[in-house]
A protein has these predicted regions:
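Hydrophobic adenine-recognition pocket in adenosine-nucleotide-binding enzymes
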Residues: 129
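Active-site beta-strand termini and strand-to-loop segments that position acidic
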Residues: 304-306
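A conserved beta-strand element that flanks and buttresses the S-adenosyl-L-methionine
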Residues: 125
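Conserved acidic residues
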Residues: 51, 122, 150
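Short phosphate-engaging motifs
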Residues: 84, 132-135
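Conserved N-terminal segment of class I S-adenosyl-L-methionine
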Residues: 1-119, 272-281, 296-300
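S-adenosyl-L-methionine-dependent methyltransferase catalytic module, highlighting the catalytic core
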Residues: 134-301
Length: 307
């Protein structure tokens, strides 16, 4: 039985998982073949020397299951959401196999575990996760400290090249900008800093992209030297630190990942669709084989490795 069939045959309504996980998986099932193709493309970019793999921000864990199915020796699943980790464990019982290690946490958790277990992963793969990570600088720093020659592959729909995708994502980001701005305003107002309305407004603007914990650590306005300048800087959830979507230029990823090398690969459309959408997807996928068609790609894949 192939992996897609094993995943589809599970009775998710009777499975002991969170309602959020259940809804997320059930929404993904209609495009499961397409999603697994994306995971396969990411894994195909890894060299044969990779044996220990990290599925970072693994969510439902489908990448982990696929990696084990493909023969990776040790798959380490990492997600900060305990409900996601519990879901992967429950799915593994149903499918009959799963990741060898399940960690609940972030890159700090992964680094600590690797140090304690004396395990050095060969690669990290993340599907639709890099655009949500709170602080990319320490993220890449921790991965490099675990293994200076770490292979990394990240797919992201937050492509800066496709104007249609950017427009759609900006609409989503604008919706959350206002919500997160009000959340920061209300939180800062509770800190008893005796701020004037203008000072409070400055704080709200200057703390864009920060969590409540980081905001609370600032004890005076002088600590904020400049207002952040990303095009849409309010889309960081101040409670969780997760960004709604973050569209970064490729040069930013290259700067953050240095001295590692960043390669850019084009994504592809869902050719499993029927009718006109399926025909259009197959035509676009054909065009994506041609040079200079990056603005057509619905997502991008970043391959990061040592020079």
């Amino acid at each position: 039985m192939d992996l897609a069939e094993s995943i589809r045959k599970i009775d998710y309504n009777s499975l002991d998982i969170s309602d959020y996980s259940r809804r997320y998986i059930q929404a993904l099932l209609p495009i499961l073949d397409y999603y697994l193709d994306i995971c396969n493309r990411a894994l195909d970019l890894l060299p044969p020397s990779v044996h220990t793999l990290v599925d970072y921000g693994g969510g439902h864990g489908f990448l982990s299951f696929l990696a084990k199915k493909r023969g990776f020796e040790h798959v380490i699943y990492v997600d900060y959401n305990p409900q996601a980790s519990a879901t992967v464990t429950a799915l593994a019982e149903q499918i009959g196999f799963g990741p060898d290690t399940v960690l609940t946490g972030d890159h700090n958790t992964l680094k600590t575990w690797c140090d304690e277990q004396h395990i050095i992963p060969d690669a990290v793969v993340g599907i639709d996760v890099i655009e949500h990570i709170y602080r990319l600088e320490p993220f890449f720093s921790d991965l490099r400290s675990i293994n200076p020659r770490m292979q990394m592959v990240f797919s992201t729909a937050s492509t800066p090249y496709n104007p249609w995708i950017r427009h759609r994502l900006h609409r989503i980001m604008h919706r959350d900008e206002e919500k997160f701005q009000q959340m920061r305003h209300d939180f800062i107002a509770t800190l008893n800093l005796e701020l004037s309305p203008n000072e409070l407004d400055h704080w709200v603007k200057a703390t864009r992209g920060m969590t409540f914990n980081d905001i609370k650590s600032i004890t005076s306005i002088e600590h904020i030297t400049s207002i952040p300048t990303p095009p849409f800087p309010n889309t960081c959830n101040p409670i969780t630190g997760s960004w709604t979507e973050r569209i970064l230029p490729i040069k930013t990823y290259r700067h953050l990942a240095a001295p590692l090398c960043v390669e850019l690969h084009k994504g592809f459309y869902n050719s499993y669709q029927r009718g006109p959408k399926g025909i259009a997807s197959r035509m676009l996928n054909f065009l994506l084989r041609l040079p200079f068609t990056l603005p057509l790609a619905p997502f991008i894949i970043l391959k990061i490795n040592a020079k």
